[in-house]
């Protein structure tokens, strides 16, 4: 088989396939990029893991335009391509190579959240349920029929990293369950294979398609004139990089809890005593209402207050509760701002 993937999300599937004894004839990943604090050229997590496993790696800048790479991949004669968050659309010349097809593990319940950031958008939109789907790939963006999926509930206090870890494990599991079915159906006429595999066309699943567009830096700005829930969703969905400003420095906000009585059962037990101490919307948005040394900063919003439990001030390390308050030298009545220049 040929494996396609780039971020750490895809590594558990690569590991699972390798550990299960499948012959992986090649791994395709994005080229090395500058990343990290040192802004150094670094291999993608998938490329690094593949090299550690002694697998052959290909890193096309744009597979659609690189006929020589396509020819080299074809020469490997892979029976199937497994794709997890590769990051490029595959052309028909690639999709048609393996006799058992190209199959993608997508981190949403299709047709909801087609595209590059389904995990982030499920959190930003306040979805209570998401999941993973194994989909037969077509030239369109995540439009193919679905072979298998698994639904999961999203917790109120679950951030993008935590949800990603859960879904990446499910992706690996679903591929291990699905590949034997795909192999048993064998190559042949697509319509007959689909019938045998009982794949479901997305238009038959129900629901209008939604698209997870690429996120920009502006999407990461916290506007305290929004509701506490909207701010909380932005913090969780864009973890760890949603940000506000503090004394002309960028303040990343990395863990929050909306102090809403209706959410009491979903809040941390230590946070619940804070409920009801402030009238919703009676204070200027962004104003610090309390510095709770063991919990963090209580900040006013358009609606109920929002508790900031973890943050990272520009030039500092991540900090919780009292340490965060000390780093900011925060006092009641001060204001967090909106970053205008990014």
From Swiss-Prot:
SUPFAM superfamilies per record: FMT C-terminal domain-like (SSF50486), Formyltransferase (SSF53328)
Class of enzymatic activity (EC top level): transferase
Catalytic activity: L-methionyl-tRNA(fMet) + (6R)-10-formyltetrahydrofolate = N-formyl-L-methionyl-tRNA(fMet) + (6S)-5,6,7,8-tetrahydrofolate + H(+)
GO MF annotation terms: methionyl-tRNA formyltransferase activity
Family: Belongs to the Fmt family.
Protein name: Methionyl-tRNA formyltransferase
GO cellular component: cytosol
Family matches, as CDD domains: FMT_core_Met-tRNA-FMT_N, Met_tRNA_FMT_C
Source domain of life: Bacteria
Residues binding (6S)-5,6,7,8-tetrahydrofolate: 108-111
Catalytic activity, EC: 2.1.2.9
Alphabetical list of InterPro entries matching this protein: Fmt (IPR005794), Formyl_trans_C (IPR005793), Formyl_transf_N (IPR002376), Formyl_transf_N_sf (IPR036477), Formyl_transferase-like_C_sf (IPR011034), Met-tRNA-FMT_C (IPR044135), Met-tRNA-FMT_N (IPR041711)
Organism: Prochlorococcus marinus (strain MIT 9303)
Lineage: Bacteria, Bacillati, Cyanobacteriota, Cyanophyceae, Synechococcales
Role, per record: Attaches a formyl group to the free amino group of methionyl-tRNA(fMet). The formyl group appears to play a dual role in the initiator identity of N-formylmethionyl-tRNA by promoting its recognition by IF2 and preventing the misappropriation of this tRNA by the elongation apparatus.
Alphabetically ordered keywords of this record: Protein biosynthesis, Transferase
